[in-house]
C-alpha cells in the first residue's frame, strides 16, 4: 500500500502565485459585468448614509502616487463602512477648469490668438474630458469601487449652474464685492492668484538700503535728516508714496560724518554694522507717533513720500522705516488707504513697467531692478547693495515668481463671516487633531478671497455692467444665467452678447439706452471645487450635506478644505463636512520629494503592471499616512512578502477545508477542545482589534494585526501543530473536524477583514470557500466578535502556555544547533517548570507532544529539580534528547510502537489504526 495516498494533504485550486497584474484586470471585468457598485448600493439600501465626498483631482496627465494614496485610503473607508451597517455611496469627481489645461493646449501647438474665446474653450473641454477618461481607467485599475459611470465633473452644465447659484447667494448676502486691491499676480499666467495657488521657493534678490531726504520735519525734525528704508524689491520704488513707522517704537537720529539718518533705535547696531558706519552717534530720539505726517522726498522723482503710522512695521529686519507702495503690498494698501494715498501701480498684466514709472517704462519688473539701483546710486540715495537668497512666493503652475499688484478684482469678503467660519472649524472633527489649529489659524488670518481670474478657461463671473458702470447682480439675472448654463453650458457666456444673456425685457436705471456689457473675468478654480457641496452633495439624491468626511492631502487645508468651508458657511451657515482627515505626501525611499530632475518618481501604473494593485493597496495600509510616507522598490518588496504570507495563509486554509461541509461537519463550540476554543478567542480578538482600527482610520494597525495573526497565531502555532491531525487522522476524526471548524471560521472572517484593503484577493478567495452563497464578499458584512463562555480564563491559561512554548522552542533550537536532534519530531523533551506552569500543564487535556511538535513529552519535577546542565528559561528548564524508537513512515513521529501491527510494519500504532479504519477494505 502507498501510505502517502492515505494522507489527507491540502487540496485546492486556489493558485499559490498571485499573478496579480494579469488576474486583477480579469476580476475587475467580472465586477463590471455584475455591476458591483450598484449591487452594493442595492444591498445596503435603507441603511444610514455615510458620505465620503471626493475632493476632485485635477484632470491633467496620469495619476501619481499622491493620487493613488488618496483614492485607496478613501476606498478603504467606503468599503469598510458598506460592510458595517451603512450605505456608503462613493461619487468620484474631477476638477476641470484652470490654467494647466490652457497651457497643455498651448504646448500642443494650439494658436489661441487665432480663434475666439468660445472656440478655445471648446478645445479645453475636449482635452479635459480626455484626461478624465485617462485618469478614470487608472483609478479603476487600483480597484477603487465607485460610481465611475456617474462622476461629477466641474465643467458639466448642471455643476456650473449650481456654482452660479452659490455665487448669487453670496452676492445677495453682501459677501461679494469689486475692489482695487493688491493681489498675488502672476506675470507668467497674466492673472491674479489665490493664496492656495502660490508656493514658496528660494529666490536671489537685491537687498538695498535707500535714503529718503526729509522735506518737511513738522517741527519734530530739523529738515536735514534722511529716512533709511530697506527693500528687496527695488522695482517697486517708482510706486513709493510713503514711509511707514511704528507708533510705539523709538526712532534715533543718527549722525554719521556730515549726514543725519533716521532709523529705529533698537536696530542701530545692526544697521551701523551693515552700512559700515564708523563714529556714528545718536543725537536725538523721538517716538514713532511723533513722526506722523512728516514728509520725505522721493529719491528720484519730484514727489512727496508721506510718513505714516503702521502696526505692520517690525524690527525683525531692515531699519524700522518701511518703504510703502499702496499698489504693491497689502499692508501698504491698508496704510495708504487710511492716509488717503492713491493706489499707484505702474506695472501691467505682463509684469512690465508702464509710463507711470518714467525712465523705466517697457522694462520687465525683474529687469528694472538694475537700472533703478543705478539711478539710486547716481542721485546719491543708495547706501548699500548686496544680494540675498530668501523664500519668495511663486506661481504653483508656472513655477515663476509672482508680484503683489493692485488691480480691480472681485472678492469674497471673508471678514463678513469670519466668526461663523471659526465656529464651523471648531464643530468639525479633525484627524489628525492638529488640522483644527491649522485651519483655524488660516481662517483667522486670511484676507478677503480674490475670486476673479483674467483667463479664458473657467466659469464666468455672472455680472453685468450698466452704461453708467454699475455692476448688476440680482436674483433675476443670477437665476437666468444659471438656467442658461444648465441648458447650454458656460460657453454660452462667450458666444452671446450681454443683452442676449439677460432675461428678456430686462431694464436697469443705469442703462437708459438699454445697453449692457458683461464681466470678462472667470472664477478662481477653488470656487469651482469649493462649490461641490452644493452642486454634488445637495443635488444628488444618493448623497447628503454635510458629508461625513472629506479626506485629502495636507496641502488642502489652504485649498479645498478652506474654499469649501468658505462657500458652505457663506451659503448655509454650516461646514460642508462633519469630519476632515488629511494625509501626507509620498516621498522616495530616502525621504526626498519626487522630481523629474532627481529621477526618483515612482509611478502607480508601473507598480500595478509589475506587482499588482493589491500590493500597492497593501503598501498604503502599511504606512503612517497622516505624515509624509516613503515608497521604493525595497519597501514594495517587503510589502509583497507580507502579501505572499497572507495569500499562502488563505491557500493553506482552503486546502485543508476541501472536504469540509459547514452544514454537516461543523463541531459545536462546546465540544471543541480548549486549544481550538483558544484559537477562536484569538480570532475574536483580531476581529475586535481590526474593526476598531478601521473605525479610527488606523489602517497600519489593521495591516500589522492581520500580518501578525497569519504569522504568529496561525503559521507558527495553530496551523503548524494542526497538520499532524489534519493530514494524519481519518477524515471524520473529531479532532480533525474540530480544527476544520475553527479554520472555517478563521477563513471566512479573515477574508472579510482584508476585503477593504485587498478586494481583488478577497474576491478571488471567496468562491473557493465551502458553503458561501453571496456572489461577492463585498455583499457581506464584517464578522462579529463572539464572546465565548470562559474566554478570559481560557486566554489567560493558553497565553501562559504560549510563553512556556516559546521556552521549549528555544531549547529545541539550541539542541538542533548542537546536533542533538535533526528536526523537532526527532526530540523527546522533559520539562521542569515553575509551580504555576506545572499546574497549568497538568490541566491541559490535549496531546502536549502534538502541541510542541515532538515525538515524546514528559513532565519532570519542579524547576529546581532539573539536571544541572539542563538549559533554564523563564518558565521552565528543558531537557532535550533523541526520542527512542523508529520513525513512522506515514506521520514521521519517532515511536516505539512501529511494527506492532504486523500488517503495517513501518507504521506506528496510531497510523496503523487510521489506515485500517479508513483505507483497508
Curated annotation (Swiss-Prot):
Tell me which cofactor or cofactors this protein depends on: Zn(2+)
- PROSITE patterns in the record, alphabetically? AA_TRNA_LIGASE_I
What InterPro entries is this protein classified in? aa-tRNA-synth_I_CS, aa-tRNA-synth_Ia, Anticodon_Ile_BEm, Ile-tRNA-ligase, Ile-tRNA-ligase_type1, Ile-tRNA_ligase, M/V/L/I-tRNA-synth_anticd-bd, Rossmann-like_a/b/a_fold
Name the chemical reaction catalysed here.
tRNA(Ile) + L-isoleucine + ATP = L-isoleucyl-tRNA(Ile) + AMP + diphosphate
Details of cofactor binding: Binds 1 zinc ion per subunit.
Q: Where is this motif: 'KMSKS' region?
A: 593-597
Q: Which segment of this protein is annotated as the motif 'HIGH' region?
A: 57-67
Pfam entry (one)? zf-FPG_IleRS
Keywords, in A-Z order:
Aminoacyl-tRNA synthetase, ATP-binding, Cytoplasm, Ligase, Metal-binding, Nucleotide-binding, Protein biosynthesis, Zinc
Q: Name one GO biological process term.
A: isoleucyl-tRNA aminoacylation
Q: What EC number(s) does this enzyme carry? A: 6.1.1.5
Provide the binding site for L-isoleucyl-5'-AMP: 552
Q: Keyword Transcription: yes or no? A: no
- MF annotations from Gene Ontology: aminoacyl-tRNA deacylase activity; ATP binding; isoleucine-tRNA ligase activity; tRNA binding; zinc ion binding
Summarize where Zn(2+) binds, as residue positions.
888, 891, 908, 911
Alphabetical GO CC annotations of the entry are: cytosol
Q: Which residues bind ATP?
A: 596
Q: Which domain of life is it from?
A: Bacteria
Q: Where in the cell is it found?
A: Cytoplasm
**Listed NCBIfam families:** ileS
Q: Which family does it belong to?
A: Belongs to the class-I aminoacyl-tRNA synthetase family. IleS type 1 subfamily.
Domain remarks in the Swiss-Prot or TrEMBL record? IleRS has two distinct active sites: one for aminoacylation and one for editing. The misactivated valine is translocated from the active site to the editing site, which sterically excludes the correctly activated isoleucine. The single editing site contains two valyl binding pockets, one specific for each substrate (Val-AMP or Val-tRNA(Ile)).
Q: What does this protein do?
A: Catalyzes the attachment of isoleucine to tRNA(Ile). As IleRS can inadvertently accommodate and process structurally similar amino acids such as valine, to avoid such errors it has two additional distinct tRNA(Ile)-dependent editing activities. One activity is designated as 'pretransfer' editing and involves the hydrolysis of activated Val-AMP. The other activity is designated 'posttransfer' editing and involves deacylation of mischarged Val-tRNA(Ile).
Assembly and binders = Monomer.
Q: What name does the UniProt record give this protein?
A: Isoleucine--tRNA ligase 1
- Phylogenetic placement of the source organism: Bacteria, Bacillati, Bacillota, Bacilli, Bacillales
Which gene underlies this protein? ileS1
Amino acid at each position: 500500500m502507498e501510505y502517502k495516498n492515505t494522507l489527507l494533504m491540502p487540496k485546492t485550486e486556489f493558485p499559490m502565485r498571485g499573478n496579480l497584474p494579469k488576474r486583477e484586470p480579469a476580476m475587475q471585468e467580472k465586477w463590471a459585468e455584475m455591476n458591483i457598485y450598484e449591487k452594493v448600493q442595492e444591498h445596503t439600501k435603507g441603511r444610514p448614509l455615510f458620505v465620503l465626498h471626493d475632493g476632485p483631482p485635477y484632470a491633467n496627465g496620469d495619476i501619481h502616487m499622491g493620487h493613488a494614496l488618496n483614492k485607496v485610503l478613501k476606498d478603504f473607508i467606503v468599503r469598510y463602512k458598506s460592510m458595517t451597517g451603512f450605505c456608503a455611496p462613493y461619487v468620484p469627481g474631477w476638477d476641470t477648469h484652470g490654467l494647466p489645461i490652457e497651457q497643455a493646449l498651448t504646448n500642443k501647438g494650439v494658436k489661441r490668438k487665432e480663434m475666439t474665446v468660445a472656440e478655445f474653450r471648446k478645445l479645453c473641454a475636449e482635452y479635459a474630458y480626455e484626461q478624465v477618461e485617462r485618469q478614470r481607467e487608472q483609478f479603476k485599475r487600483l480597484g477603487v469601487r465607485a460610481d465611475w459611470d456617474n462622476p461629477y465633473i466641474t465643467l458639466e452644465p448642471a455643476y456650473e449652474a449650481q456654482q452660479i447659484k452659490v455665487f448669487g447667494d453670496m452676492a445677495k448676502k453682501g459677501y461679494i464685492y469689486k475692489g482695487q486691491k493688491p493681489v498675488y499676480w502672476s506675470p507668467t499666467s497674466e492673472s491674479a492668484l489665490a493664496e492656495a495657488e502660490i508656493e514658496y521657493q528660494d529666490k536671489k534678490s537685491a537687498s538695498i538700503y535707500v535714503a529718503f531726504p526729509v522735506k518737511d520735519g513738522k517741527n519734530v525734525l530739523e529738515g536735514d535728516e534722511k529716512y533709511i528704508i530697506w527693500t528687496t524689491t527695488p522695482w517697486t520704488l517708482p510706486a513709493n508714496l510713503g514711509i511707514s513707522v511704528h507708533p510705539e517704537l523709538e526712532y534715533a537720529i543718527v549722525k554719521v560724518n556730515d549726514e543725519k539718518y533716521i532709523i529705529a533705535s533698537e536696530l542701530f547696531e545692526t544697521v551701523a554694522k551693515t552700512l559700515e558706519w564708523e563714529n556714528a552717534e545718536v543725537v536725538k530720539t523721538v517716538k514713532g507717533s511723533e513722526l506722523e505726517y512728516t514728509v520725505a522726498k522721493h529719491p528720484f522723482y519730484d514727489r512727496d513720500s508721506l510718513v505714516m503710522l503702521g502696526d505692520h512695521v517690525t524690527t525683525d529686519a531692515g531699519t524700522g522705516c518701511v518703504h510703502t507702495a499702496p499698489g504693491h503690498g497689502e499692508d501698504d494698501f491698508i496704510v495708504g488707504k487710511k492716509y488717503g494715498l492713491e493706489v499707484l501701480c505702474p506695472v501691467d498684466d505682463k509684469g512690465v513697467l508702464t509710463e507711470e514709472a518714467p525712465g523705466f517704462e517697457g522694462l520687465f519688473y525683474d529687469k528694472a531692478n538694475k537700472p533703478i539701483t543705478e539711478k539710486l546710486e547716481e542721485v546719491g540715495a543708495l547706501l548699500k547693495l548686496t544680494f540675498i537668497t530668501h523664500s519668495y512666493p511663486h506661481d504653483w503652475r508656472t513655477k515663476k515668481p509672482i508680484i503683489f499688484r493692485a488691480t480691480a478684482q472681485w472678492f469674497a469678503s471673508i471678514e463678513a463671516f469670519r466668526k461663523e467660519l471659526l465656529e464651523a472649524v471648531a464643530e468639525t472633527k479633525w484627524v489628525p487633531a492638529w488640522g483644527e489649529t491649522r485651519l483655524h489659524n488660516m481662517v483667522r488670518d486670511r484676507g478677503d478671497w480674490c475670486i476673479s481670474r483674467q483667463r479664458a478657461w473657467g466659469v464666468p463671473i455672472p455680472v453685468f455692467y450698466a452704461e453708467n458702470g454699475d455692476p448688476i447682480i440680482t436674483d433675476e439675472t443670477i437665476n437666468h444665467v444659471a438656467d442658461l448654463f444648465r441648458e447650454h453650458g458656460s460657453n454660452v457666456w462667450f458666444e452671446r452678447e450681454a443683452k442676449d444673456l439677460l432675461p428678456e425685457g430686462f431694464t436697469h436705471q443705469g442703462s437708459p439706452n438699454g445697453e449692457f456689457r458683461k464681466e470678462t473675468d472667470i472664477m478662481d478654480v477653488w470656487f469651482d471645487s469649493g462649490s461641490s457641496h452644493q452642486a454634488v452633495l445637495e443635488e444628488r439624491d444618493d448623497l447628503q450635506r454635510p458629508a461625513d468626511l472629506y479626506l485629502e492631502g495636507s496641502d488642502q487645508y489652504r485649498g479645498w478644505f478652506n474654499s469649501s468651508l468658505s462657500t458652505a458657511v457663506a451659503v448655509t451657515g454650516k461646514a460642508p463636512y462633519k469630519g476632515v482627515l488629511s494625509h501626507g505626501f509620498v516621498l522616495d525611499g530616502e525621504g526626498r520629494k519626487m522630481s523629474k530632475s532627481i529621477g526618483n518618481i515612482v509611478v502607480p501604473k508601473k507598480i500595478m503592471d509589475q506587482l499588482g494593485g493589491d500590493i500597492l493597496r497593501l503598501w498604503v495600509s502599511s504606512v503612517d499616512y497622516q505624515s509624509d510616507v516613503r515608497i521604493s522598490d525595497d519597501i514594495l518588496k517587503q510589502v509583497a512578502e507580507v502579501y505572499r504570507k497572507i495569500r499562502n495563509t488563505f491557500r493553506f486554509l482552503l486546502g485543508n477545508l476541501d472536504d469540509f461541509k459547514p452544514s454537516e461537519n461543523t463541531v459545536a463550540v462546546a465540544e471543541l477542545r480548549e486549544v481550538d476554543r483558544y484559537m477562536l478567542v484569538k480570532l475574536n480578538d483580531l476581529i475586535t482589534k481590526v474593526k476598531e482600527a478601521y473605525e479610527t482610520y488606523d489602517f497600519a494597525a489593521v495591516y500589522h494585526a492581520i500580518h501578525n495573526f497569519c504569522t504568529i497565531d496561525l503559521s507558527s502555532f495553530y496551523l503548524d501543530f494542526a497538520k499532524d491531525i489534519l493530514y494524519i487522522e481519518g477524515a471524520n476524526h473529531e479532532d480533525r473536524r474540530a480544527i476544520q471548524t475553527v479554520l472555517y471560521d478563521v477563513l471566512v472572517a479573515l477574508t472579510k477583514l482584508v476585503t477593504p484593503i485587498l478586494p481583488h484577493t478577497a474576491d478571488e478567495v471567496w468562491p473557493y470557500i465551502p458553503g458561501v452563497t453571496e456572489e461577492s464578499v463585498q455583499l457581506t458584512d464584517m464578522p462579529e466578535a463572539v464572546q465565548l463562555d470562559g474566554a478570559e480564563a481560557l486566554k489567560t491559561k493558553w497565553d501562559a502556555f504560549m510563553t512556556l512554548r516559546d521556552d521549549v522552542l528555544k531549547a529545541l533550537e539550541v539542541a538542533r544547533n548542537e546536533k542533538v536532534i535533526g528536526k523537532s519530531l526527532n526530540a523527546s523533551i522533559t520539562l521542569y517548570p515553575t509551580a504555576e506552569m506545572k499546574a497549568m500543564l497538568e490541566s491541559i487535556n490535549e496531546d502536549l507532544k502534538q502541541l510542541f511538535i515532538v515525538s515524546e513529552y514528559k513532565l519532570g519535577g519542579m524547576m529546581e529539580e532539573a539536571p544541572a546542565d539542563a538549559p533554564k528559561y523563564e518558565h521552565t528548564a528543558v531537557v532535550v534528547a533523541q526520542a527512542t524508537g523508529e520513525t513512522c513512515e506515514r506521520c514521521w513521529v519517532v515511536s516505539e510502537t512501529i511494527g506492532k501491527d504486523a500488517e503495517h510494519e513501518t507504521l506506528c500504532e496510531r497510523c496503523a489504526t487510521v489506515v485500517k479504519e479508513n483505507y483497508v477494505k
